[in-house]
UniProtKB/Swiss-Prot annotation:
Keywords linked to the UniProt accession: Chaperone, Membrane, Transmembrane, Transmembrane helix
Transmembrane region(s): 156-175
Database matches in PROSITE patterns: DNAJ_2 (PS50076)
Swiss-Prot/TrEMBL GO biological process terms: protein folding; response to unfolded protein
Alphabetical list of InterPro entries matching this protein: DnaJ_C4, DnaJ_domain, J_dom_sf
Any Pfam family: DnaJ
Signal sequence range: none
Protein name: DnaJ homolog subfamily C member 4
Cellular component annotations (GO), alphabetically ordered: membrane
Domain J: from-to ranges: 34-99
One Gene Ontology molecular-function label: unfolded protein binding
Topology in membrane: Single-pass membrane protein
Regions of compositional bias (Polar residues) in chain numbering: 119-129
């Protein structure tokens, strides 16, 4: 009879140690019950405050910090769900109405479990897709998206090269056109100057001929100069025949 007493005591002793049960209970009590508690903001926080709190928490709970810790992934998904609800005005108003009406909304953990179950039955999604879905301008980079982005980059590069070649061609054509216009202008100017010079030279020749004719005419009208008359010779005295 006495030897059976320790066996009965072992059967009555709980399988889980009290410390483990207390830790689990404390973990359940410490787990946030609302999205505001999960993000660490008050219910009257602005959208910018919610965004800053999400960024701060996401750095701490991102799965890439400790890939071997599965709890980080679930907590990060809960955080993303809380940010998705509280960052949009309509969903946040509906969530606040549920809190005020007394009908308890789904806790972050329940919502995450429901979404996880739905995702297991649906098609596979890349990791951190829910995290990247919070931002409209950023998307997860899968192999197909990278190939598509690479193809788009090639197209943009081709368009840039075509524009550059077209610009060089237009620049060359414009340069040739301006050069031709300048040559035509200089030729026209040279033609005008040459014509003016030839006309002035012809006038000078004509004026020279007229002057020569006038001189000849004036020379014919004037009489030749008369010789001076000699007076009577004076014979000196003593000179006789």
């Amino acid at each position: 009879m006495p030897p059976l007493l320790p066996l009965r005591l072992c059967r009555l002793w709980p399988r889980n140690p009290p410390s483990r049960l207390l830790g689990a209970a404390a973990g359940q009590r410490s787990r946030p019950s609302t999205y505001y508690e999960l993000l660490g903001v008050h219910p009257g926080a602005s959208t910018e405050e919610v965004k800053r709190a999400f960024f701060s928490k996401s750095k701490e709970l991102h799965p890439d910090r400790d890939p071997g810790n599965p709890s980080l992934h679930s907590r990060f998904v809960e955080l993303s769900e809380a940010y998705r609800v509280l960052s949009r005005e309509q969903s946040r108003r509906s969530y606040d109405d549920q809190l005020r009406s007394g009908s308890p909304p789904k806790s972050p953990r329940t919502t995450v479990h429901d979404k996880s179950a739905h995702q297991t039955h649906s098609s596979w999604t890349p990791p951190n897709a829910q995290y990247w879905s919070q931002f409209h301008s950023v998307r997860p980079q899968g192999p197909q998206l990278r190939q598509q982005q690479h193809k788009q980059n090639k197209q943009v590069l081709g368009y840039c090269l075509l524009l550059m070649l077209a610009g060089m061609g237009l620049h060359y054509i414009a340069f040739r056109k301006v050069k031709q216009m300048h040559l035509n202008f200089m030729d026209e100017k040279d033609r005008i100057i040459t014509a003016f010079y030839n006309e002035a030279r012809a006038r000078a020749r004509a004026n020279r001929g007229i002057l020569q004719q006038e001189r000849q005419r004036l020379g014919q009208r004037q009489p030749p100069p008369s010789e001076p008359t000699q007076g009577p010779e004076i014979v000196p005295r003593g000179a006789g025949p």
